[in-house]
């Protein structure tokens, strides 16, 4: 049985989210208002919809790759997270990454895409050390940001 996603259209004049092509992972989200973003400017843009993400799943708001490549429009907290318990309007925190040109977004423009994925919800267990918890050392250990190298400037 396929998973369904309940969608409330808060703005009846905007289309329901939809996939551009059969098999696409994400559904397009539309801007519910006109917005002009100056270079480097951010705006929280409403989409005119609310969704009920099923328990055990998460909604992830991703940039549209064409907009990112063509005009530098992206999402500040990419991907944005829509938790299963959230029932309010989906809003997208957009940013203009172009250093010189403003970006004009018109009501009804496709601005982002929503992916719904299963998510593990592990029980958190406090331990005093990973050794005590019986978890083996790894080759990475506590090597964090930049620890794997791989860039000429590092």
Curated annotation (Swiss-Prot):
Binding-site residues, substrate:
64-66, 77, 81-83, 91
Extract the coiled-coil ranges from the record. none
Which pathway does the record list?
Answer: Pyrimidine metabolism; dUMP biosynthesis; dUMP from dCTP (dUTP route): step 2/2
**CDD domains to which the protein is assigned, alphabetical:** trimeric_dUTPase (cd07557)
| Biased composition regions of type Gly residues, renumbered to the chain | 144-154
EC assignment: the record states 3.6.1.23
Spell out the reaction equation it catalyses.
dUTP + H2O = dUMP + diphosphate + H(+)
Q: Where are the transmembrane segments?
A: none
Q: Where is the signal peptide?
A: none
What are the GO BP annotations of this UniProt entry? dUMP biosynthetic process; dUTP catabolic process
Pfam families, sorted:
dUTPase
What are the required cofactors? Mg(2+)
List the residue ranges of the region (Disordered).
135-154
Q: What class of enzyme is it?
A: hydrolase
A Gene Ontology molecular function term for this protein is: magnesium ion binding
Q: Tell me the keywords, alphabetical order.
A: Hydrolase, Magnesium, Metal-binding, Nucleotide metabolism
Task: Please describe the quaternary structure of this protein.
Answer: Homotrimer.
- Function description: This enzyme is involved in nucleotide metabolism: it produces dUMP, the immediate precursor of thymidine nucleotides and it decreases the intracellular concentration of dUTP so that uracil cannot be incorporated into DNA.
Q: Look up the further comments and give them.
A: Each trimer binds three substrate molecules. The ligands are bound between subunits, and for each substrate molecule, residues from adjacent subunits contribute to the binding interactions.
Annotated family: Belongs to the dUTPase family.
Name of the protein in its database record: Deoxyuridine 5'-triphosphate nucleotidohydrolase
């Amino acid at each position: 049985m396929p998973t369904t996603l309940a969608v409330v259209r808060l703005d009846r004049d905007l289309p329901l989210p939809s996939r551009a092509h059969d098999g696409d992972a994400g559904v397009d989200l539309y801007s519910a208002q006109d917005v002009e973003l100056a270079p480097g400017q951010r705006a929280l843009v409403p989409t005119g919809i609310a969704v009920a993400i099923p328990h055990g799943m998460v909604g992830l708001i991703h940039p549209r790759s064409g907009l990112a490549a063509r005009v530098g429009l992206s999402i500040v907290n990419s991907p944005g997270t829509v938790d299963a318990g959230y029932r309010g309007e989906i809003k997208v925190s957009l940013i203009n990454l172009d250093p010189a040109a403003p970006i004009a977004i018109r009501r009804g423009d496709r601005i982002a895409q929503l992916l719904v994925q299963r998510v593990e919800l592990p029980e958190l267990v406090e331990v005093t050390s990973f050794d005590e918890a019986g978890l083996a050392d790894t080759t990475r250990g506590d090597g964090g940001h930049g620890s794997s190298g791989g860039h000429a400037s590092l």
